[in-house]
């Protein structure tokens, strides 16, 4: 039988590219979670709009940021997976959101 940690770490990965219109709502849905054992990773494909300005507003809540050109969505997702250290992995892409502040509980 596996020992399950009573407070597992969630690695949440947001993959984004030129998503300034929808990204802030996504980030806010993470930073307002009442569950605290969350590792937040953002993988940006080298955005040329205001995406990084939004990301920088929340930098104290983002554990890892990668911003560089990639080979598409799945390449960016794989970068995030390699960086994740959590017990559980969740993709929450730009425009998605956790709709309640206790979603991870």
What are the functions of these language-model segments?
Residues 1-105:
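Nucleotide-sugar donor-binding/catalytic module of glycosyltransferases
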